[in-house]
From Swiss-Prot:
GO BP of this protein: nucleobase-containing small molecule interconversion; pyrimidine nucleotide metabolic process
EC number: 2.7.4.25
Catalysed conversion reaction: CMP + ATP = CDP + ADP; dCMP + ATP = dCDP + ADP
GO cellular component: cytosol
Protein's name according to its UniProt entry: Cytidylate kinase
Gene3D superfamilies, A to Z: P-loop containing nucleotide triphosphate hydrolases
Amino-acid positions noted as binding ATP in the UniProt annotation, renumbered to this chain: 11-19
Principal location: cytoplasm
Source superkingdom: Bacteria
InterPro entries on file: Cytidylate_kin, Cytidylate_kinase_dom, P-loop_NTPase
Localization per Swiss-Prot or TrEMBL: Cytoplasm
């Protein structure tokens, strides 16, 4: 690939975006950028520093002091791999509050776009195809039922040894769907030119094959 390639994958929480984006990234030699993990990193640091979502000025100063980049598909914050920390339930419950702040989104979107100017990238999130990479070469919107997404998250966390309750995860996903879809700034929605894929019951590799078939045309 001589010219830079950009791929946008959007969808609600637990639709399989990050797993699928990683595989597609490896297959097509694209840098995988998990934008959700960047918002989770902000949430992690805000909670550690007792900065509420209402304290926007403090949040922006905090973000300006955060050095974020990706190594082997994992987020490195100020020299530390924080991937195990940002997938904890407490972060999942609070991330929507911080991610809905206009100034926070502007800061992080600017950083994401700079990455896409340097490398061929695949990004997943809520507003990649509609906001971050409006001119992406390929746009996909992944969906799945709330129950299926809760089951995936439950198994993922239990597999990591985290004791969680399925019903709590399901309610959290339903709540996050509502917040993400109804927030004032850059709500979750499918880009008009995105290809929608329902991942319910298909399996990861089935979705990868579908996306690959579009990209190889």
């Amino acid at each position: 690939m001589n010219k830079l390639i950009t791929v946008a994958i959007d969808g609600p929480a637990g639709a399989g975006k990050s797993t699928i984006a990683k595989i597609i990234g490896e297959k097509f030699n694209l840098m995988y950028i998990n934008t959700g993990s960047m918002y989770r990193a902000v949430t992690l640091k805000a909670l550690e520093n007792n900065i509420s979502a209402e304290e926007v000025d403090k949040l922006l100063v905090m973000i300006d002091g955060m050095d974020m980049h990706f190594e082997n598909d994992e987020l490195i914050l100020n020299g530390e791999n924080i991937n195990s920390l940002i997938t904890m339930p407490n972060i999942s419950k609070n991330v929507s509050a911080y991610a809905s702040i206009r100034e926070v989104r502007e800061r992080l979107v600017n950083l994401m776009r700079k990455m896409a100017l340097k490398y061929s990238v695949i990004m997943d999130g809520r507003d990649i195809g509609t906001v971050v990479l409006k001119d992406a070469n390929f746009k996909f919107f992944l969906t799945a039922s709330p129950e299926e997404r809760a089951d995936r998250r439950y198994k993922e966390l239990m597999g990591k040894g985290v004791e969680v309750n399925y019903d709590e995860i399901l309610q959290d996903i339903i709540k996050r769907d509502y917040l993400d879809s109804n927030r004032e700034v850059d709500p979750l929605r499918k880009a008009e030119d995105a290809i929608e894929i329902d991942t319910t019951g298909i399996g990861i590799m089935g979705v990868v094959e579908k996306i690959s078939s579009y990209m190889e045309k």
